[in-house]
A protein has these predicted regions:
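Non-catalytic terminal and connector segments of soluble metabolic enzymes
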Residues: 2-205
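Catalytic metal-binding acidic patch
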Residues: 209-213
Length: 213
């Protein structure tokens, strides 16, 4: 079953019956998350909390340099809402600091549940819970916090696939890569940057400054 077929199947089940808002699907979901550079001081701490909530399978650090802005635009290319009113450009302006390092991670959700948003978008409930908890606990710690400039997590299979393709396009910027023992790499695997633990290379981000350019 393709990603689109899976999402269509979920959507049909959600729409069946006026009271049915949530559906279980017994396949696994592999949401892709991004910890934006604004939160690097807390990246290690946030990843450890995420690992308590869900099984983290892979963690990468990308140092995007001059291609940082284009990476953000590519991530939200299919998100019309992000472009309305110039929101995406305000987001980039807020996040465009002298530090261009981001953390990309993948985790596993077994037996995920889904809901349909008001705009019709299918959302993995467990993935959204991770995102909402991190925002709730860390938004107040970020100087000049601007909504969504801390963490991004894919909401469904199709969005995860698009994010995966985007991240893999920028694989040359990888400076750290961890794959959980016993699992195959989902993101492109950069063996030259391989690490047995993501805790150590995330620790190195704590000193990152976030002065706006």
């Amino acid at each position: 079953m393709t990603e689109k077929q899976l999402n269509d199947k979920i959507l049909c089940k959600i729409k069946k019956g006026d009271t049915m808002q949530v559906v279980k699907n017994h396949n696994s979901e592999y949401p892709i998350g991004i910890l934006w550079n604004m939160g690097n001081k807390y990246a290690r701490e946030m990843m450890l909390k995420i690992a308590i909530m869900e099984d983290v399978l892979q963690v990468k650090i990308l140092d995007l340099g001059k291609d940082y802005e284009q990476f953000v635009l590519d991530c939200y290319e299919r998100d019309e809402e992000a472009y309305e009113g110039g929101y995406i450009y305000e987001k980039i302006k807020n996040m465009n600091t002298d530090n261009k390092r981001i953390v990309v991670f993948i985790f596993n959700v077994d037996n995920p549940t889904y809901q349909q948003a008001e705009d019709g978008k299918i959302q993995c409930i467990e993935a959204r819970q991770v995102k909402q908890r991190i925002r709730k606990e860390y938004a107040s710690k970020i100087d000049e916090y601007f909504f969504d400039n801390l963490i991004h997590i894919s909401d469904n299979v199709e969005e995860a696939k698009r994010t995966l393709n985007t991240v893999n396009k920028y694989d040359k910027y990888t400076i750290g890569n961890y794959v959980r023992k016993g699992y195959k790499s989902i993101l492109n695997e950069s063996t030259k940057c391989q690490s047995k633990s993501y805790v150590s290379f995330l620790e190195n981000l704590r000193g990152d400054k976030d002065e706006r350019e």
